[in-house]
């Protein structure tokens, strides 16, 4: 569920998001690599027509920082990753894709390479 990050990782470790974030951010998926002490926030964006997702893509840096407030309490880092379908290969996304990388976030098309999450 979208609440798994909280139910299975943060709450059992005594982290109450309300003390650090004004919003309970709900990632599509979260993978925690205990060996590298990194939380991977994974957002899936699969479009087949124009929509409101376009503006949301540039929020990755802000959201990564929001998650980092929680993970850093446990000495964990955070990586923010988008998984896109081919819709986002259109030229009109060139600038936002460049921005995503420029601010230290990542994106992949269709699937995430295991090496990206430390496996």
Model-predicted regions and their roles:
Residues 29-33, 38-47:
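Conserved catalytic cores of phosphodiester-cleaving nucleases, focusing on short active-site segments
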Residues 53-72:
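Short, charged, amphipathic alpha-helix that recurs within catalytic cores of restriction-modification
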